[in-house]
């Protein structure tokens, strides 16, 4: 996926061998260490040919070989989530400067920290509600829910929506971006709807124009990845967040922060199916609550985040 996104922007893409080592079994550790070593050699070759003025890391184990190979190059580390993962923590020793999304991240680092906000694609801001609704075929007669589980989808969110689909469509128009994994199941459910309800259900496996979906929606139901800290504030979009329970706790920290700021409601994954419909009904019956959530989300927006990061990179590169 990363390769196709990078190439779509006309940027050269190169891959290297890499593998994580934290939490890896003793059986797999030799293999992963070998991949790490091969990644360092591959990164050295690429850096020697490319001769970068600055390195920019956003985490992930694939960054470790590049950091080891490029210790002589000025480096900016960007922390997208509030709490840095283990890979990001291991990269801090190589960073000349650290950029963070919110001030909550500053306590994790001793080095100079720059709060930039979460950088967004410029095309997101091109959409307004009217244009987005027309593009997606939204009637605008009912409140609009955006259901989104990331590029691969979120099974528990998809299933909770399917289990409550007719009740939801009685009160809402829904944009449901399911991901490829559950798409056939979602498609089958859509085909079984009566015509009136099917017209309110805009289901897709993937949507490149995410700005349209965000601009058209009144509420989003999603995981709590780092993009929630940037995309939802840009549109002042209140959120029902369902942190992914089977990974590092960064999603829980992100969700709790947005809830603390009054911009989101947090539901546990295991209780989502039972609580989703009730939660949405309560929220949309309280117009003042929705209004305050929108305002709170707007307050967290950093529309110039990418510009700030670019400025930091230019300064480090000395150009």
Regions found by a protein language model. Name each.
Residues 239, 257-269, 281-283:
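A short acidic/histidine/glycine-rich donor-binding loop in glycosyltransferase catalytic cores
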Residues 302-319:
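C-terminal alpha-helical cap of glycosyltransferases
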Residues 42-55, 62-76, 89-97:
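Glycosyltransferases and closely related glycan-assembly transferases
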Residues 1-38, 44-45, 180, 268-270:
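Conserved nucleotide-sugar phosphate-binding/catalytic loop shared by glycosyltransferases and other
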Residues 289-303:
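A short, well-ordered alpha-helix in the C-terminal region of glycosyltransferases
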Residues 12, 71-130, 135:
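Active-site-proximal region of nucleotide-activated glycan assembly enzymes
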Residues 52-54, 207, 211-229, 237:
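Acidic donor-binding loop of glycosyltransferase active sites
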Residues 5, 129-134, 138-219, 251-255, ...:
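Donor-nucleotide binding loops and adjacent catalytic segments primarily
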């Amino acid at each position: 996926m990363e390769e196709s996104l990078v190439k779509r922007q006309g940027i050269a893409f190169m891959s290297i061998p890499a593998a994580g080592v934290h939490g890896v079994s003793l059986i797999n550790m030799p293999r992963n260490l070998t991949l790490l070593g091969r990644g360092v050699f591959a990164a050295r070759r690429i850096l020697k040919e490319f001769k970068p003025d600055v390195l920019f890391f956003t985490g992930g184990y694939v960054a470790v070989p590049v950091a080891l190979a490029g210790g002589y190059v000025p480096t900016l580390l960007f922390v997208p989530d509030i709490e840095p993962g283990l890979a990001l923590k291991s990269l801090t020793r190589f960073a000349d400067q650290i950029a963070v999304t919110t001030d909550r991240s500053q306590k994790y680092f001793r080095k100079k920290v720059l709060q930039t906000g979460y950088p967004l694609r410029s095309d997101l801001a091109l959409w307004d509600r009217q244009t987005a609704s027309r593009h997606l075929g939204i009637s605008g007669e009912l409140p609009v829910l955006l259901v989104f589980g990331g590029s691969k989808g979120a099974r528990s969110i998809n299933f909770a929506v399917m289990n409550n689909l007719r009740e939801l469509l009685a009160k809402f128009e829904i944009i449901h971006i399911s991901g490829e994994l559950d798409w056939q199941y979602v498609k089958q459910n859509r085909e079984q709807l009566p015509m009136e309800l099917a017209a309110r259900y805009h289901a897709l496996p993937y949507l490149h124009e995410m700005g349209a979906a965000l601009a058209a929606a009144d509420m989003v139901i999603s995981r709590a990845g780092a993009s929630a800290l940037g995309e939802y504030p840009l549109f002042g979009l209140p959120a029902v967040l369902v942190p992914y329970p089977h990974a590092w706790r960064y999603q829980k920290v992100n969700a709790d922060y947005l809830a603390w700021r009054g911009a989101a409601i947090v539901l546990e994954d295991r209780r989502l199916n039972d609580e989703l419909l009730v939660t949405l009904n309560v929220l949309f019956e309280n117009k003042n609550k929705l209004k305050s959530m929108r305002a709170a989300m707007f307050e967290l927006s950093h529309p110039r985040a990418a510009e700030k990061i670019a400025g930091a990179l230019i300064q480090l590169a000395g150009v």
